Design a protein with these regions (language model features):
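Helical element adjacent to the flavin cofactor pocket in flavoenzyme catalytic cores
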Residues: 61-71, 185-194
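Glycine-rich Rossmann-fold phosphate-binding loop(s) that bind the pyrophosphate
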Residues: 9-12, 122, 144-146
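FAD-binding core/adjacent interface of flavoenzyme oxidoreductases
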Residues: 1-6, 62, 66-141
Length: 194
């Protein structure tokens, strides 16, 4: 199958690219490939609004129908041939393109050991898993003090859970914010039981 625009990834950058494409080309075929099981959604809600604002998963899905996008869920692109303008997916199917965007986003670092109770929080499926754990567990360890780690810690705490945060930096958001703000956040989290 050939696409005028082939996008690898299903996050916010990919969705924004589709909006930009449709702003200049209403007819060109678009194929979006993502390894996720869910259609594109607003990722920030996973660590905030779904926990504290009474939102549901139905509130976060992005409308893909109006943009005429062929959405390939649970599909990983394993090879890119820039010379021949083609990609191969994880079952060996080849797709060609005129323009390619790789917008896969980042993935959390993995620990050198595993457990069913370790969640590398990034996807709607990760949200579902963590939400299910909150039904049976009271104590949570959040590794990471950046945006997602601090949002998850805050959301869990606001839902009455005991939360411990661990991070290699000197404070919450230390790699993101000025020292004064990071120090304030440390105090704020500690004052609120984290």
């Amino acid at each position: 199958m050939n696409y005028k625009y082939l996008i690898i990834g299903g996050g916010m950058a990919a969705h924004s690219a589709i909006g930009g494409i449709r702003g200049i080309d209403n007819e060109g075929s678009i194929g979006m490939f993502t390894g996720e099981t869910d259609p594109p959604y607003d990722r920030p809600h996973l660590s905030k609004g779904l926990w504290t604002k009474g939102e549901s998963l139905n509130d976060i899905w992005r409308d893909m129908n109006s943009d005429s996008v062929d959405l390939h869920l649970r599909t990983l692109i394993t090879s890119i041939d820039i010379t021949n303008k083609s990609v191969i997916d994880d079952i060996g199917k080849t797709y060609t393109y005129e323009k390619l965007l790789v917008a896969t986003g980042g993935t959390p670092r993995r620990l050198p050991f595993g457990s069913d109770h370790i969640i590398y929080f990034r996807t709607a499926e990760d949200y579902r898993t963590l939400r299910t754990l909150t039904d049976t567990q009271q104590r949570f360890l959040v590794i990471g003090g950046g945006f997602i780690g601090s949002e998850i810690a805050s959301s869990l705490r606001q839902n009455g859970k005991e939360v411990i945060m661990v991070f290699p930096e000197n404070g919450v958001g230390a790699n993101i914010y000025p020292n004064d703000l990071s120090n304030f956040m440390n105090e704020y989290f500690a004052d609120n039981g984290v």
